[in-house]
Amino acid sequence: MLLPIVVLVGLPGAGKSTIGRRLARALNTELVDSDELIERATGKACGAVFSELGEPAFRELEAIHVAEALKSSGVVSLGGGSVLTESTRELLKGQDVVWIDVPVEEGIRRTANERSRPVLQAADPAEHYRNLVKVRTPLYEEVATYRLRTNNRSPQQVVAAVLHHLEID
């Protein structure tokens, strides 16, 4: 069975999709984004699907598409909350999983005005984001083989760090 070259995880706004696209280009391979698989399957934006189904049903649907994405031999980018599902965490065992770890204040800044992410909709978005950090950090720690802190790094520097981790530089 083929395994992805690398799987990217991290909070909303961490830059998984941006880094994934650039990394796939650098490796001359495909990017499979689990959020895009959901959007293709439903014909709707992920945020709309999340709002319509509610989080538990969305996570079930997401787990199906994560399993599909992990059959790729390229770069895989997972939705920020995908690690909440135990079956996804099990599937990530044995994979090279890079946690794109964005500083909390940067993540808040990047997602503050995004209406397309219902998981972040709250009376106090900054406090809600901090709560996501608290809940998800132990799960990212569980699945990640490499934690890449993006502090003050450009996307090019993050890609270079992932390539170095993969010993492809």
Curated annotation (Swiss-Prot):
What broad class of enzyme is this?
transferase
> Which cofactors are named for this entry?
Mg(2+)
State its Enzyme Commission number(s). 2.7.1.71
Gene Ontology BP terms? amino acid biosynthetic process; aromatic amino acid family biosynthetic process; chorismate biosynthetic process
**SUPFAM superfamilies documented for this protein:** P-loop containing nucleoside triphosphate hydrolases
Gene Ontology molecular function: ATP binding; magnesium ion binding; shikimate kinase activity
Q: Where are the transmembrane segments?
A: none
Read off the Gene3D superfamilies from this record.
P-loop containing nucleotide triphosphate hydrolases
Q: How is the cofactor bound?
A: Binds 1 Mg(2+) ion per subunit.
Cellular component, GO, one term: cytosol
Protein residues bound to Mg(2+): S17
Pathway-wise, it operates in: Metabolic intermediate biosynthesis; chorismate biosynthesis; chorismate from D-erythrose 4-phosphate and phosphoenolpyruvate: step 5/7
Catalytic reaction equation(s): shikimate + ATP = 3-phosphoshikimate + ADP + H(+)
Q: Which HAMAP family match?
A: Shikimate_kinase
Q: Which family, according to UniProt?
A: Belongs to the shikimate kinase family.
Q: How does it assemble?
A: Monomer.
The identity of this protein, by name, is Shikimate kinase
Where does this protein come from, organism-wise? Corynebacterium glutamicum (strain ATCC 13032 / DSM 20300 / JCM 1318 / BCRC 11384 / CCUG 27702 / LMG 3730 / NBRC 12168 / NCIMB 10025 / NRRL B-2784 / 534)
At the highest ranks, the source species' classification is:
Bacteria, Bacillati, Actinomycetota, Actinomycetes, Mycobacteriales
